[in-house]
Amino acid sequence: MNRFIDWLWVRRLRRLPHFRSPKMLGLPQKQRVLVFAPHSDDEWIGCGGTLSLLKANQCEIRVVVLSDGAQGDPSHFFEGDVKKKRQSETREVLGVLGIDDPCFLNFPDGGLAEHLADLRRAVAQIYDEFAPDWVFTTSFTEHHRDHVCVAYAVAHHWLSRGRRERLLAYEIYGSIRVDWLVDITSVMALKRDMIRRYEIPLHYVDYEAACVSVAQFRGILVAGDPLEASFAEAFMEIKPLDVWLDVFGRAMDRVG
């Protein structure tokens, strides 16, 4: 068996190109795009540049923030209502693009795993009412539990609907399998400006610098002048096997 597996690997390796870049994602025109963000600012960190380009393509975009953001200021830099502040930041930033009326589900920040049944019902209702053509969510490889819970709720409803829409996972804290890239060089300055408007998170992490670094790293794979900096956002196209492998892997983790 080991010899056979070794033979398969050798055949595969010899057929690989010297360097293989992910494909560039062709963005739709005038379609309905639904974005699920575990927390305020996740939508901009993960796919803000792509949302800017989709809005320029006259797409109708709905952003859903699932947690209430109450745990977003543990050191109490902000003296007012943290939940209201984080929601107002989201409204302001999305309003710059003309994305109005973001939906806030107000599940407990950091506690989505304790409300999975309600989370799935809420995701399903919004999903079905909006009837999207494209859906963006966090990935199963995230290191934040809330992010994985959102990926779980969205992906399982997508499966139940028969996988009719394109479902793409963006990256925040966990790297993903890069199936697609979107060149966001033309809107990177806008993305940086929008990230700076989320004041509370910036007290804890320099998300602007982090976003620039990740986008520039992903931009290495964008074809173009190697002497000019390119910026990109990466996406994983979720497939049914990804969902089942994740569930199986987590079950085995619990058994072990």
Indicate where each model-derived feature is located.
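Short, well-ordered beta-strand micro-motif
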Residues: 183, 234-236
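Amphipathic alpha-helical coiled-coil segments
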Residues: 221-225
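Carbohydrate-associated surface elements
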Residues: 173
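Active-site beta-strand->loop->alpha-helix modules in alpha/beta enzyme cores, enriched
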Residues: 1-40, 44-169, 196, 213, ...
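A conserved mid-domain beta-alpha-beta active-site/ligand-binding segment of alpha/beta enzyme cores
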Residues: 177-178, 182-202, 206-220
